[in-house]
From Swiss-Prot:
It is found in: Nucleus. Residues 842-883, 904-923, 960-971 have a biased composition (Low complexity). One of its GO terms (cellular component) is nucleus. Residues 1-50, 96-119, 450-488, 499-518, 842-1016 are annotated as: Disordered. Component of the NuA4 histone acetyltransferase complex which is involved in transcriptional activation of selected genes principally by acetylation of nucleosomal histone H4 and H2A. The NuA4 complex is also involved in DNA repair. Involved in gene silencing by neighboring heterochromatin, blockage of the silencing spreading along the chromosome, and required for cell cycle progression through G2/M. This is Enhancer of polycomb-like protein 1. The keyword DNA damage applies. Keywords: Cell cycle, DNA damage, DNA repair, Nucleus, Transcription, Transcription regulation. It comes from the Eukaryota. Belongs to the enhancer of polycomb family. GO terms for biological process: DNA repair; regulation of transcription by RNA polymerase II. Its main location: nucleus. Residues 103-116, 457-473 have a biased composition (Basic and acidic residues).
Length: 1016
């Protein structure tokens, strides 16, 4: 690949453009132009340089303009200052300049030409053959493989052991290790019987160089993992026992079930030996050999490496001492320094500034961005990993199958050898018969049921029948004259219908699991019920259990179970006496407290008959016999006096024979004794455990407790706890009052007997019984019992709040707030329902009232209006207009009832008018502002807050239309006006000035009645 040189020659423009040129690194994404030789300019025959080099020299010499596609010398900028490279460039530049000055200066000396021609970049000469190669590489056992590609392993997988021996290690191996180790005498056997797989021969074999490197490599890896900061104090290195224990543990803990998972330090051992060990363990096959290994037929080969536990056992200690000496000498660092690479987790500047990093990257590190394509890429990587796992599983299963086949062939070969030897021995002895044992029998072939073929045959038969039927129908249709077209059309329709039915049947069979059969093909079977199926299932289970019990009984025949753990152990639940300071009042509400309260003892159950036999120790056990030592006769067994001594603690121990919790509970239920729920189960068990706990010393329990506290007015109080206990029995006997004692107390009072017989209520302050009860009530609130004793008396507390350690005051507040919130919710729901019902009733009434008003207005327009009583009506109208701003106006005497309510929102008005047919001979104007805005608001707070007032107004509205006197005085009508109060939803009064909507003002008095004149 070459690039055209620049065509320009010198100039200011060229220098300016050259200064603006910016070099870019070669990118893989951008294409590069490739020129052929014919595209390049012709060169002189004496010039041996490439066009790109000539262009580079021209640009450097004359500072000409660089071409965009100009290529450098192929060397980095920081490496262009290398000595040999500069010499070659300078020599080439001299040659180029000499050829440009009219074919060079012919006066140049021959010596300069020779020196320029001798300048070159030194490279190793690979054309020669090394004669001493056979001296150092004398490995004749290596065989060149047919193909070099054997498996897709990386370089790290085939690199082998990372530790390499040097001269010091080689001297130690030859002078010390080979002479003194292994310390096992080699077996004196013939060379013909020498076998490499023999354990004794493995122990006698010397340590090879590869094995020495493996041991040192393991020590290096383990010490790097366990002591990463060993360079701080090299003398504090781990001992050989600790390191060998870590190495052997890692060797034994290979995960066979999950071969893809490599945890911990297993990732560091990527080598051929590690792969062989892992695969040999997974396949349980040794030795694991690859195609790159040497031939196993070569006895001198050192390829067979013993496992690391064996190497540590034979050569571990001396190799460890040698390695430790070199490790301390290196001050805790690696014995052989390794190359330093870029740290991907470190900062890019740190990697760039570190001078010891080799093999730096030339491309830029791209910044990671979270994009949507990352999820797709991750999913594809997961699928690829799954497919690789499947491929690996397939390969491993194939390997296991081949190993099983190999084992089968080896066993067949061994059987054949044994048969041949037995046949020869049979011939020598002269035994005849049993010849069928000396030849392999033919194995029966497994006949597979070919269901698919049968299905195919049945489908073919059905198709043939269908085709015959169609052909017969076609023949019958064509034989009839004049019906050929009709027959063909019918056949085509039938075919289409059959095809559609066939397709629908196929679709239904693919979607539904059930097939609908015609009644003729349904088999005659009885209906199987669920109860019958369950009954058969239970019977089979019972039969299986009985069969197992029968077999077990036959096995245990003539045996008596006197073991410590029989088949059906006996459970005894008692109160736990170990935990005395625990809170036991919330046992029914907490499983944790119940586990600490009850103590379960498992014992064995010994029948009374067996107990008597063991206690007597005279009679032999029934059904047990022994063999006599003299003649082997079977005689009845002698008694076992020592057996009763062994089980004596089980028989006499009252702790195991005490009444259990379940037995006590059942007896209480039978006797209707439910005092244990109030008094506690501990009182019943307390008497049983008194004898057992009498001898036990209670060192941890204090005698009593005192507490000093300061009360009001700086008074000191001393509270005692545990000083005295309530005498329950004495107080209970003392509190048992007879009728005579009560009567005696009553006689002492200054009350007549007649009043006593009438009232039968004694005076509280004079009654002796009440005084004693009040005295006893003090013990209930001032008790010296401990929490454990309280728990024994009343373990089943009636207060569930004690489970969460909540005080009584807090619990009462919580309970009251809960009831209040619940009642508030119920009240709110009921009020809401009541409001909806009232609003619905108001809607119905307004609709009815509108209908009545329309009828009355139609009747009023037809009748004439009289002007006799206009003067009296004007006074009443003025009074109405003066008080209409308050929201409601009722005129009961004049027969007019007008109720107007303004909404708080100011948008709607609910008004109910119940008018008479005639008002003083006049008619009502239908264009009143209250009537024009006559609507029903469902969210009206006026209706919600005044349901009672509304019902009262409705009572007044239901006045029947009767004739009233037209000469009623205006003062009397004004005196009958009643203004109702209005409230908002918060209960506060609403002033008429705050109401929005239409109002009655004195200015529009002329609009109240159609025939009312203005009053001046």
């Amino acid at each position: 690949m070459a690039i055209h040189p620049s065509k320009g020659t010198g100039g200011s423009k060229q220098s300016n453009s050259g200064a603006r040129f910016r070099q870019r690194k070669i990118s893989v994404k951008q294409p590069l132009t490739i020129y052929k030789q014919s595209d390049l300019p012709t060169l002189n025959a004496s010039n041996d340089l490439e066009p790109s080099q000539i262009h580079h020299l021209n640009s450097n010499a004359n500072q000409q303009q660089r071409d965009i596609h100009a290529i450098e010398t192929g060397v980095d900028k920081n490496e262009e200052d290398e000595v040999h490279l500069q010499q070659v460039i300078n020599a080439a530049q001299k040659v180029l300049l000499g050829s440009q000055n009219e074919d060079g200066d012919k006066k140049k000396d021959d010596s300069d030409k020779k020196t320029d021609a001798s300048v070159y970049i030194p490279t190793p000469d690979a054309s020669r053959i090394w004669t001493d190669a056979s001296k150092y590489y004398n490995d004749k056992s290596f065989r060149e493989p047919e193909t070099y590609i054997k498996f897709s392993a990386t370089v790290e997988d085939t690199v082998g052991v990372e530790f390499n021996m040097d001269e010091i290690d080689e001297e130690f191996l030859k002078n010390k290790l080979w002479k003194n180790y292994p310390k096992v005498k080699s077996p004196k056997v013939k060379s013909e019987k020498l076998d490499d797989t023999n354990k004794e021969n493995d122990n006698a074999r010397k340590c090879s160089e590869v094995e020495f490197e493996i041991i040192c490599d393991k020590l290096e890896k383990i010490i790097e993992e366990k002591q990463p900061f060993l360079s701080m104090d090299p003398s504090n290195i781990l001992s050989f026992k600790e390191l060998s224990a870590y190495i052997i543990e890692e060797f034994n803990n290979s995960n066979k079930d999950k071969p893809y998972v490599q945890l911990g330090s297993n990732l560091k051992y990527i080598s051929t030996t590690a792969l062989k060990e892992k695969l040999s363990k997974e396949l349980s096959f040794e030795p694991f050999v690859t195609l790159f290994d040497k031939s196993l037929l070569d006895q001198t080969s050192t390829n067979i490496v013993r496992p690391i536990p064996k190497l540590l056992e034979l050569f571990g200690e001396p190799v460890y001492e040698h390695w430790k000496y070199r490790k301390i000498e290196r001050k805790g660092k690696q014995i052989h320094p390794a190359l330093k690479f870029e740290d991907p987790s470190a900062n890019e500047k740190d990697n760039d500034n570190d001078p010891y990093i080799c093999f730096r990257r030339r491309e830029f590190r791209q910044a990671r961005k979270t994009r949507r394509a990352d999820t797709l890429g991750a999913e594809r990587i997961r699928l690829l990993q799954k497919s690789m796992h499947r491929a690996r599983d397939l390969v491993m299963s194939v390997c296991r199958r081949e190993l099983i086949k190999l084992e089968n062939w080896e066993t067949d070969h061994a059987i054949f050898k044994l048969r041949s030897d037995a046949k020869n021995l049979k011939r020598v002895v002269g035994v005849k018969g049993d010849d069928f044992l000396f030849y392999p029998h033919k194995r029966k072939k497994i006949i597979k049921v070919k269901e698919e073929d049968e299905d195919k045959e049945s489908s073919k038969i059905k198709r043939d029948k269908r085709s015959r039927f169609d052909s017969s129908r076609e023949g019958s249709a064509t034989s009839m004259p004049g019906s050929a077209t009709i027959g063909t059309n019918a056949i085509n329709k039938d075919r289409l219908a059959n095809g559609q039915v066939h397709h629908t049947q196929e679709a239904s069979s693919s979607s539904q699991p059930y097939v609908k059969l015609p009644p003729s093909k349904i088999p005659d079977m009885g209906l199987v019920t669920v109860s019958l199926v369950l009954k058969e299932k239970n019977e089979t289970i019972k039969r299986a259990v009985l069969e197992k019990l029968r077999k077990r009984k036959e096995q245990d025949k003539d045996f008596i179970n006197v073991t410590d753990d029989p088949y059906q152990p006996f459970f005894n639940i008692a109160t736990n006496t170990k935990f005395k300071n625990n809170e036991l009042k919330h046992i029914p509400y907490s499983s944790i407290a119940a586990t600490s309260f009850h103590e379960i003892n498992t014992t064995n159950y010994i029948s009374e008959k067996l107990k008597n036999l063991l206690e007597e120790g005279k009679k032999p056990l029934p059904g047990t016999k022994t063999f006599r030592g003299s003649n082997g006769e079977l005689i009845p067994s002698k008694p076992f006096p020592h057996l009763s001594a062994l089980i004596q603690d089980r028989i006499d121990n009252s702790q195991f024979n005490s009444v259990s919790y379940i037995a006590q509970l059942l007896s209480n239920i039978e006797n209707n004794n439910f005092s244990a729920y109030n008094n506690g189960y501990g009182q019943q068990q307390q008497h049983q455990h008194q004898e057992t706990n009498r001898d036990k010393t209670k060192l941890s329990d204090p005698i009593f407790r005192l507490r000093k506290r300061v009360g009001r007015f700086n008074r000191n109080f001393v509270d005692r706890r545990g000083l005295m206990k309530r005498p329950n029995d004495v107080i209970d006997d003392f509190l048992k009052f007879d009728d005579e004692g009560v009567n005696d107390d009553c006689d002492q009072m200054d009350v007549d007997s007649e009043s006593i017989s009438k009232n039968n209520v004694p005076n509280v302050y004079d009654s002796r019984v009440d005084e004693i009860k009040r005295l006893d009530s003090r013990w209930q609130f001032d008790n010296d019992l401990t929490e454990y004793d309280k728990g024994l008396q009343s373990p089943f507390s009636l207060d569930p709040s004690r489970l969460n350690c909540i005080s009584d005051d807090t619990q009462s507040i919580r309970f009251g707030s809960m009831l209040l919130s619940k009642s508030y919710d119920l009240l709110r729901d009921s009020v809401h329902q009541r409001q909806q019902a009232l609003v619905q009733q108001a809607r119905m009434r307004t609709l009815q009232q509108q209908q009545r008003n329309n009828k009355q207005q139609a009747a009023g327009q037809s009748s004439g209006s009289s002007s006799a009583s206009l003067g009296s009506n004007t006074n009443s109208n003025s009074s109405i207009s003066g008080q209409a701003d308050q929201g409601q106006t009722n005129l009961t005497n004049s027969g007019i009832t007008r109720q107007g309510g303004a909404n708080v929102n100011g948008s709607q008005t609910s008004t109910t008018n119940n008018t008479r047919s005639s008002v003083s001979g006049g008619s009502m104007n239908p264009k009143l502002p209250t009537q024009s805005s006559q609507r029903s608001n469902t969210n009206s707070p006026l209706l919600a807050s005044q349901p009672q007032g509304y019902s009262q107004q409705q009572k007044f509205n239901k006045i029947p239309p009767t004739s009233q006197s037209q000469s009623q005085s205006p003062t009397h009508a004004a005196g009958q006006l009643q203004t109702s109060k209005m409230y908002n939803k918060h209960g506060s009064n609403i002033t008429p000035s705050n109401l929005k909507g239409p109002k009655f003002t004195p200015a529009n008095n002329n609009q109240i009645g159609g025939s009312l004149p203005n009053r001046k």
